């Protein structure tokens, strides 16, 4: 039995500062405000594909793509991948599709990428849902392992990282770990993690996040309710969305509530 296509899947060639990319994208068109989704480290564009099964989002165009070093996207030089390159990739994807203003959703690495994108071009962003993206040094519980569990061999580091993640107590950690080796190129790990740590420690991310002039939501799993800054950012106008029965991965542990909170913020914009 054939089924109507929920979205279009394609690859688009881009050149970012001399790095050749073939970016794997899923997208659809529509009359309403578009949504740009940025996935986290170890995830892919498919984290957001089920937007097409959520009736409240009917009519909204969306774009989700595999970041360089991840999923089906091809990259000519994995060693060049860092957060600034990921930001430029997002800008190039938006340009390719002719998107001017948009709602922004980013998870983890994608949340940090989204923050830097929004900081550079705040006039283009209608709203920002930051799903446990880095806004403070304490958010580097995954990426800081590049320093805390240092290995000279990147393949050995990544293998050990996967095993630590598989045994972690956070909800959905084992599920996440099971596909890490298939979704991330080993050669991209160090550059991404070191860039995330450097920005979290030295990039004034909290100041950037709080200065954004549009509706913002910080979504987090209940197991991360200990984050020290939550009450402070709420007092400064950030909407908090705590997801029960969930850790770092609401799209795996509680997707229904994740979608509800995303829509609630976008309706405020």
Where are these regions (language model features)?
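Conserved serine/cysteine hydrolase catalytic core
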Residues: 190-242, 251
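Catalytic histidine-centered segment of alpha/beta-hydrolase-like enzymes
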Residues: 246-259
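Short beta-strand immediately N-terminal to the catalytic nucleophile in serine-hydrolase-like folds
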Residues: 104-106, 131
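Gly/Ala-rich beta-loop-alpha elbow adjacent to hydrolase catalytic centers
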Residues: 106, 110, 114
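Flexible "cap/lid" loop of the alpha/beta hydrolase fold
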Residues: 115-119, 125-157
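Conserved acidic catalytic loop of the alpha/beta-hydrolase fold
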Residues: 84-102
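Conserved HGGG/HGGXW glycine-rich cap/lid loop of the alpha/beta-hydrolase fold
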Residues: 19-72
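Conserved alpha/beta-hydrolase catalytic His-Asp/Glu region
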Residues: 140, 155-211
